[in-house]
Amino acid sequence: MNIGILGIQGDIEEHEEMIKKINHAPKRIRTIEDLKNIDALIIPGGESSTMGKLMKTYGFIEALKNADLPILGTCAGMVLLSKGTGKEQPLLELMDITINRNAYGSQKYSFESELELNGIKINAVFIRAPTVDKILSDEVEIIAKEGGNIVGVKQGKYMAIAFHPELSEEGYKFYEYFLNEVVKND
């Protein structure tokens, strides 16, 4: 499968390496034309306000709202998939959730935590991580919690997580999970 990684800001190279590790082809997405011929898209972590502005400037907001494409959002990607954050910023609004940005505090409060997603254990890296504040419809499934906070959700062809699987040695397991749960079932 060809897995696109939005290449305007964030942990792009790390996601590419994980996609290669599970024997799929990563494709860096820099323009809306690059969205052709991919089977799924990853929106990486980064700074969600900056990413949202760049996505709007380059036409990604409208293009992705109209695309029939499975999407994984990690950290800032989770924020961008949400309906709202309590702050004015461009969002895709594809998932029926609202977000608490930087719920765990500043970068100095980054941490790792063992999470289990449907029997898959991974060491999750949280950096200035968001959490789901509200679930707005029954279509949203909780797939991960950390300390009582919702840090992973799935809705149809969209999956959003607060952590960085690309920074964990066994993070490739999460990409396999995404491809099996969302992309292959689409």
Swiss-Prot record:
Reactions catalysed, as given in the entry: aldehydo-D-ribose 5-phosphate + D-glyceraldehyde 3-phosphate + L-glutamine = pyridoxal 5'-phosphate + L-glutamate + phosphate + 3 H2O + H(+); L-glutamine + H2O = L-glutamate + NH4(+)
Q: Which HAMAP family match?
A: PdxT
Which gene name does the record give? pdxT
Listed CDD domains: GATase1_PB
Active site per database record:
C75 (nucleophile), H164 (charge relay system), E166 (charge relay system)
**MF GO annotations:** glutaminase activity; pyridoxal 5'-phosphate synthase (glutamine hydrolysing) activity
Query: Keyword Signal on this protein?
Result: no
Which GO biological process annotations does it have?
glutamine catabolic process; pyridoxal phosphate biosynthetic process; pyridoxine metabolic process
Q: How does it assemble?
A: In the presence of PdxS, forms a dodecamer of heterodimers. Only shows activity in the heterodimer.
Q: Could you say which protein family the record assigns here?
A: Belongs to the glutaminase PdxT/SNO family.
State its Enzyme Commission number(s): 4.3.3.6, 3.5.1.2
**What NCBIfam families does UniProt report for this protein, alphabetically?**
PLP_synth_Pdx2
UniProt keywords (A-Z) are:
Glutamine amidotransferase, Hydrolase, Lyase, Pyridoxal phosphate
Q: List the disulfide bonds.
A: none
Q: Which Gene3D superfamilies match?
A: 3.40.50.880
User: Its annotated pathway?
Assistant: Cofactor biosynthesis; pyridoxal 5'-phosphate biosynthesis
Q: Does the keyword 4Fe-4S apply?
A: no
This chain belongs to the protein called Pyridoxal 5'-phosphate synthase subunit PdxT
Residues annotated for L-glutamine binding in this entry: G46, E47, S48, R101, I127, R128
Q: Summarize the protein's role.
A: Catalyzes the hydrolysis of glutamine to glutamate and ammonia as part of the biosynthesis of pyridoxal 5'-phosphate. The resulting ammonia molecule is channeled to the active site of PdxS.
**A GO CC term assigned to this protein in UniProt:** cytosol
